[in-house]
Amino acid sequence: MYSKISILLLLAFMSISSMAQTVRNNYPNFQSPKRETRAVWLTTFANLDWPKTYATSPENIERQKQELITLLDQYQQANINTVLLQTRVRAATIYPSAIEPWDKCITGTEGKAPSYGYDPLKFVVDECHKRGMAIHAWIASMPAGSKRSLGARMLVQKGFKLRYLSTGAYLNPADSQVPNYLAQICGEVVRNYDVDGIHLDYIRYPDGWSSPTGRYGDTRDDRRTQITNIVRAIHDQVKAIKPWVKMSCSPIGKYADLNHYSSKNYNGRDRLSQESQEWLRQGLMDQLYPMQYFRGTNYYPFLADWEENKHAKEIVSGIGTYFLDPREGNWKLNEVKRQMNVSRDLGIGHAHFRSAFLTNNKQGILDFEQQFNAYPALPQALESKQQTVAAPSYCKDNDLIMSEDSNTKQLAWEGISPYYNIYASKTFPVDITKAENMVYAKFSGKMLTLKNPYQQHNIHYAITAIDRFDNESIALQERSRTTASAHSAMLSNDGITLELPCKMVAFKARYYTVETLQGNIVRQLSGTPKGNTVSIIGLPNGMYKLKAMYPHSKFASNIGFFFVNN
């Protein structure tokens, strides 16, 4: 039997051939998944990605905002759904913090706030949510900037004993003050902003730090424990404030040496005390974005290792998109295509490092991203204590379609969820399990005006609610324009009893099942109904599918659909 690593390597190197590449070019048209994290790191350090204009006047603030809008519009066109925004840069922030100073990337001056009530972080959060994108606050954990930076000097004033290396100043992970301090910063962000995640970067011992002495308090295990304690403090703070906020980090791309593949003495666990797979197992992380900026056997075996040790959490492969630039590595585009394709084959999302190399369309990477992500996708859902998400309901006109003319169609609904997904299809009921039927993901309103191409005849619509944990409700299907064939498959009910077709009753099923359109069984009904009806008391409003299991049959038979609207 082939190992997962062997299969991955076979997939990767097969895709080098021209024939396999032709197949891969068509891949997005029929394999774009409904749930997948598609992310980009948006770097504010040294103004690398954004902003390019300092917010020193009303006009410049508007330019800074427009730069951000342009980037987000490019992401949206490529169906990217997650933005990792560098929020704590180097012991300095891009928001008004009560703990640390302003980073100079916003106004050009350390410690100087922008005027005119402008809050860059709030602006990015709002603009991301307008586009249905998740926004994660990227926190650079250990770096404190240069020795003379304002952030580093303020840390010294607070009693931190920084370590100074050739690359700058760093917090000491062994310092007992560090876990609570970083937790306070993350708590401040989560408490004051509607972010969807906290993303920890450089949550490890820095490069260039002396090796463990082996004496008490400074062994490899001690160092791993110190980093894990920092992660735990941040996790506990964040989840206590908003349990739906996703915890993630960007670990070194190789966790440890593998049986047949060496990390070449540079890995997270043994070299830098970063036990990220253990954080998944303990529930301290919801996602990992390993920085896999490698090729060939330095990439694919380690990708498989991340997937095999994800402990029912989520892995998002960090792609070294910057290597497409001749000044950085001069990779060929096919290398990145292969990595993205193989990651998707394995059910793994992808994240581009970093934004400028994607949006500048190096070697056509943005064009490929748009093809690869043929349809919108939802992020992976978190587990929550809430059993079901309340479905949306009709407005007073008892239908989704409020008005339509030759140019537009207006949909409207009611509900209590923060976001909604809109689906469209030529078949009824709309199958919400198919990514190609999704028109909008995580739409924040309750009314939508559609223009071309969704105003043609014979297009049907459905709405689902999505909660803060990214769990989805059953669908609210439109009622006004179902075809005759669709009506014939609809089963009559009054919200209490469901009427079965007489011919179905005669076949004497062993039992019936009621399923959501996602295929989840929500109720099993007796195969010996009273007359030709069965009870459906207590089913929430929405569209359902009825199936029957007959004697001597291995598979359930579709009976029809019914709609509950109490």
Sequence positions of predicted segments:
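Catalytic domains of carbohydrate-active enzymes, especially glycoside hydrolases
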Residues: R63-A92, N192-V195
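Active-site-adjacent "subsite" loops/lids of carbohydrate-active enzymes
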Residues: K34-T37, T43-K65, H136-E188, N192
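Beta-strand-rich modules
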Residues: L450-N471
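C-terminal tail/sorting-segment detector
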Residues: T482-S485, M543-N566
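Polysaccharide-binding and catalytic clefts of secreted carbohydrate-active enzymes
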Residues: I80-N81, R88, R131, R153-E278, ...
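Short, surface-exposed loop/turn motifs with a glycine/proline- and acidic-biased composition
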Residues: Q455, S526-H552
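Pro/Thr/Ser/Gly-rich low-complexity, intrinsically disordered linker/stalk tracts
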Residues: A374-I416, D470-H487
